[in-house]
From Swiss-Prot:
Assembly mode: Part of the 30S ribosomal subunit. Contacts protein S5. The interaction surface between S4 and S5 is involved in control of translational fidelity.
The species this protein was found in: Desulfotalea psychrophila (strain LSv54 / DSM 12343)
Domain S4 RNA-binding: 99-170
Presence of the UniProt keyword Ribonucleoprotein in the record: yes
One GO BP: translation
Keywords associated with the record: Ribonucleoprotein, Ribosomal protein, RNA-binding, rRNA-binding
Record's protein name: Small ribosomal subunit protein uS4
């Protein structure tokens, strides 16, 4: 299975934005971005000439891909689904990304990062409405109940993650029941709740050129 194996902290520095890809480390003084908030490489601190519109659009797409941990083929497919839906294509794209099961597992607090959430899903620790689902890209729907398998609930890492979720908060479209290791999808996510600085129109403009 294809995956991105590049250095995680370099991605944040490349985007000049903390993407919270390494869980608890991102909230500590060990965060590489906090210590070196400039682009990676020998000339990372140098001044660059003005970039083209295409480069800006491409960078925005790469940022969102890194944030959600999605590779190009799947990202493009998600965009095509967003474009086919009613409404604004860019907003639809972000909502589809938010509805991914690995993202919902992360948002609910079962994992400290989306990378860890993908591992939890793939290793068959997650149930949807009582049935095991091991597909990270699975789209959660309103009314779904996401829960941790009984055998997985003793995992100290998961317990720590649920305690730490208070630091970043749980979005209003999810309702967390920490005691029972469950999260209910109260509603579909909306654009206003995605607080990371994303200019989705740039992604739409980029794909419209192809």
């Amino acid at each position: 299975m294809a995956r991105n194996i590049g250095a995680v902290c370099r991605r944040c520095r490349r985007e000049n934005l903390k993407l919270f890809l390494k869980g608890d480390r991102c909230y500590s003084d060990k965060c590489s971005f906090e210590r070196r908030a400039f682009a990676p490489g020998q000339h990372g601190q140098a001044r660059f000439k003005k970039v083209s519109d295409y480069a800006v659009q491409l960078r925005e797409k790469q940022k969102v891909k890194s944030m959600y941990g999605v590779l190009e083929a799947q990202f493009r497919l998600t965009f095509e689904k967003a474009e086919a839906q009613k409404g604004v294509a860019g907003e639809n794209l972000l909502i589809l990304l938010e509805r991914r099961l690995d993202n919902a597992v992360f948002r609910a607090g079962f994992a400290s990062s989306r990378t860890q959430a993908r591992q939890i899903v793939r290793h068959k620790h997650i149930l949807i409405n009582g049935k095991r689902v091991d597909i990270p890209s699975y789209q959660v729907s309103e009314g779904d109940v996401i829960s941790l398998r009984e055998k997985s609930r003793a995992n100290a890492g998961v317990v720590d993650n649920l305690e730490a979720v208070v630091r970043r908060g749980v979005p209003t479209w999810l309702e967390l029941d920490k005691d029972n290791f469950k999260a209910s999808v109260k509603a579909l996510p909306n654009r206003e709740e995605i607080t990371m600085p994303i200019q989705e129109r740039l992604i739409v403009e980029l794909y419209s050129k192809n």
